Amino acid sequence: DTLSLREKIAAFQAAYIRCIDRNELENWPDFFLPQCQYTVTTADNHRAGLAAGLIWASNRAMLQDRISALRHANIYERHSYRHIVGLPFIVDSQAQTASSETPFMVARIMHDGETSLYCTGIYHDVYNTSANTLRLKSRIVVCDSSRIDTLMAIPL
């Protein structure tokens, strides 16, 4: 039933953003299937059907590598995120998959306390629903603006 699925996806979204907002990034890849797609792109590129994105990963190992590089190799100004998400809209539901769209806003908090609106957009998600726990098969993060004012280090 759709309401139950919507509640499951909303709970999944809450756990996902909690993981990122609490800087528990080593757990972030666990929200995805081993073979998955994670892309961050702009609304213009998404509308034009352009596959390239600001971030592009085709499996969980690439997501794990991204976090490892973030923790040990990349140099960036320390900051954190605070997500606010809307309710998911169920686009489609099949026997073992479901797709949804969820709007989001992300505030960026810099190490000195400065807080600004960093990004708004929508998550286009495809979930594997065959197990007791939802896992993402695909997450396309579509940012409303084409202007990202800093290196996107932390995943959205």
Report the location of each language-model feature.
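A beta-strand edge to alpha-helix "cap/lid" segment located at domain peripheries
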Residues: R82-I84, F89-L156
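A generic "alpha-helical surface" signal
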Residues: E7-A10, L54, A61, Y118
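A solvent-exposed, acidic/Ser-Thr-rich amphipathic alpha-helical stretch
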Residues: P34-P103
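A short glycine-rich, hydrophobically flanked beta-strand micro-motif that places a catalytic Asp/Glu
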Residues: E26-N27, H83
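Short helix-to-loop capping/linker segments positioned immediately adjacent to catalytic or ligand/cofactor-binding
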Residues: Y16-R18, R71-R78, H111-E114
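Hydrophobic pocket/interface hotspot
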Residues: Y16, W28, L63, S100, ...
